[in-house]
UniProtKB/Swiss-Prot annotation:
Keyword field: Adaptive immunity, Cell membrane, Disulfide bond, Immunity, Immunoglobulin, Immunoglobulin domain, Membrane, Secreted, Signal
Region feature Complementarity-determining-1, mapped onto this chain: 44-52
Region (Complementarity-determining-2): 70-72
Protein name (record): Immunoglobulin lambda variable 10-54
GO cellular component assignments: extracellular region; immunoglobulin complex; plasma membrane
Region of interest: Framework-3: 73-108
GO biological process terms held by the UniProt record: adaptive immune response; immune response
Taxonomic lineage: Eukaryota, Metazoa, Chordata, Craniata, Vertebrata
Gene symbol of the encoding locus: IGLV10-54
InterPro entries, per database record: Ig-like_dom, Ig-like_dom_sf, Ig-like_fold, Ig_V-set, IgV_Light_Chain
Subunit (UniProt): Immunoglobulins are composed of two identical heavy chains and two identical light chains; disulfide-linked.
Main location: secreted
Amino acid sequence: MPWALLLLTLLTHSAVSVVQAGLTQPPSVSKGLRQTATLTCTGNSNIVGNQGAAWLQQHQGHPPKLLSYRNNNRPSGISERFSASRSGNTASLTITGLQPEDEADYYCSALDSSLSA
């Protein structure tokens, strides 16, 4: 079986239009099939520390898909291979057992805690 690398591109996204969250992520992560990749997102304590982060996956030509929100809450239908966590001001998304379809852009998004639904 040929060995393949997956490139996971990380993009920082703030869902707050007035106040930028100041989130930072490494530009990319490359791993082999069936390996584990961990993506990180660091921001200020008012955003990542209080609210956690949402993680989204986007394949080229398709809209973003929500993978996780407020730390490790997964929407229905999202595989348990995607697991989010937070330590201090750093949010992480871990993808286990990487599959070809995991090659995508990943967005870390933060919400302003002063916003209400």
